[in-house]
Amino acid sequence: MEYSTFGKHIIVDLWGVDFSLLDDMHFLEYHLVTAADYSGAHVLNVSKKEFQPYGVTVLVLLSESHLSIHTYPEQNFAAIDCYTCGTTVEPQIAIDYIVNILKPERMHIKRLIRGIGEIVTAD
């Protein structure tokens, strides 16, 4: 069986997010796994790390690639990354879910199409 190299990659910077949400590893893990499920992805594993004095990284390994968040609560900032291979998963659904939960004051987003030769911006 030959697999397609096509993939969608969405990177997001969130600013103005509540400190307590960004420093709660279990809250973020639950919502990233839920977001992955809603997008149609298959969760394989979750790796997470709390940093001192603040901050969290959660990486959700997907059969289709990954979903991650890195937080800087003291700056009310989160960086989210979602890359999915193939056409069966829609990463925008995962991103929309997370943004709705975190309610940032502002957001910067880039959507990329990968695996078709040149990396193409989908915005």
Swiss-Prot record:
One of its GO terms (cellular component) is cytosol. It comes from Bacillus cereus (strain ATCC 14579 / DSM 31 / CCUG 7414 / JCM 2152 / NBRC 15305 / NCIMB 9373 / NCTC 2599 / NRRL B-3711). The record marks 64-65 as: Cleavage (non-hydrolytic). NCBIfam families: SAM_DCase_Bsu. Pathway: Amine and polyamine biosynthesis; S-adenosylmethioninamine biosynthesis; S-adenosylmethioninamine from S-adenosyl-L-methionine: step 1/1. Belongs to the prokaryotic AdoMetDC family. Type 1 subfamily. Catalyzes the decarboxylation of S-adenosylmethionine to S-adenosylmethioninamine (dcAdoMet), the propylamine donor required for the synthesis of the polyamines spermine and spermidine from the diamine putrescine. It catalyses: S-adenosyl-L-methionine + H(+) = S-adenosyl 3-(methylsulfanyl)propylamine + CO2. Heterotetramer of two alpha and two beta chains arranged as a dimer of alpha/beta heterodimers. The active site is at 65 (schiff-base intermediate with substrate), 70 (proton acceptor), 85 (proton donor). The modification Pyruvic acid (Ser) is found at residue 65. SUPFAM superfamilies: S-adenosylmethionine decarboxylase (SSF56276). This is S-adenosylmethionine decarboxylase proenzyme 2. GO terms for biological process: spermidine biosynthetic process. The gene is speH2.
